[in-house]
Structure formats: C-alpha cells, structure tokens
Amino acid sequence: MNVSYGVYVSPSAAAGTLPTTYLQLHKTSGTNQQSVLNFTNLTIARTQCTLNTDAVVPFGDVTPSQTSSGDGIKVQSSLGVNCTNEAGAPTAISYSVTQKTQAGDKYTLPMTLMAGGGIVGDIRGFLGANAATDAGCATNASSVPMDSTKVGLRSISGNESWSEPLVWVLCPKATAEPGRATAAASIDVYW
C-alpha cells in the first residue's frame, strides 16, 4: 500500500508555524476495527530561502564633474540566495525591491537630502550577468524594478545557493544642493 499526503497553503495565508501533523489509517471489517498505520509528528517538506546583500551602499562624495558625465556613480555588489527545497519539487524563486523613502518611478529610487529632503539624484539597480555592462543612468534589460514588482530569478528542484552580480548606480542631479543624502529600500525573496 502506498500512502501520500499533501498540505495546501493559500497564497494569501499569513506566515506562521506548521502545526503538529498526524496521519492515521484504520481498517474496518464489520464491527472489527484495526489501526493499520499511525504516524505522529510528520514532517512537511518545504522550501525556505535566505537573501544576502550589502545592507549599506556607500556612493561617497559626489563632485560636480560626476553630475554632468551621465554615467552615474557605480557600486559593485551581489545578491546571494540560499534555498533549501526539501520536497524536491520545482519551485520558482523571485525577488522584489520596495522603496522605503520617497517613491520614484518604476526603476528609480530618489536619494534625498537628510536636511531639507530635496532630491539630489536617483538610484538605479542592475542585476544579472549583464549588470556591469548595462549599469548607467538609463533603463536596460537588467534594470531592477523599484516598485515591488516580483521578478523571477530561477526555478530550483533541490538545495541551491547562488550569487547574482548587482550594480547600484547613483545618477546625481546637476541642480542638487550639497549635503548628506540617503535613500532606503528593502529586497525580499519569494518562493
């Protein structure tokens, strides 16, 4: 006899712990009942992923010549992903970037003065094999959406760890006032 079971989790379910799971099979013949199988504390195979990237991206001091070049100020980084897939079933892994400070457009995160809040430039991200080539102050194929759009990374069928090249670019505005500036965003991984 082969027995299999599954657990369905609604996509809208809140995160939480898995309950203790039991499986019992009974065989009945007339009034005669027998316990055939009794499993307690079944383990539900699941996928879990963690994300590793720089928490702070320092662009340094911006000079007037950097505001007119149009290339932006580039900082090399990486997006590291570590996933365990206990079930072995194909699982799509994706990510999203959500702006935590003033909203920009789909592909930009405004950098604002810490005193006064004026916008001094836009930050762009570029992810993947072409990130270094694409990185600049224009949208390209490897551009990172900054509007919470989920973007696929890859599909996994087992335990996998990998790192994707990530380039952050600050595109300073020629009209920016001098001073310290900041921007914040969160990167989330989904499976």
Predicted regions and their residues:
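N-terminal export/ancillary region detector
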Residues: M1-Q48, P64-S65
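Beta-sheet-dominated interaction scaffolds and their linkers
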Residues: V56-G70
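Short, solvent-exposed loop/turn segments enriched in Ser/Thr/Gly
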Residues: A13-Y22, D71-S78, S161-E164, T175-A184
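Short proline/glycine- and polar residue-rich coil/turn motifs
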Residues: S68, M114, L153-S161
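Short, low-complexity, Pro/Ser/Thr/Gly-rich segments in the mature regions of secreted, periplasmic
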Residues: N41, A184-Y190
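Proline-enriched interdomain boundary motifs that mark the N-terminal boundary
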Residues: Q48-P58
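Short edge beta-strand/strand-turn motifs with a hydrophobic/aromatic core
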Residues: N2-P11, W162-A174
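Surface-exposed interaction patch
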Residues: S69-A141
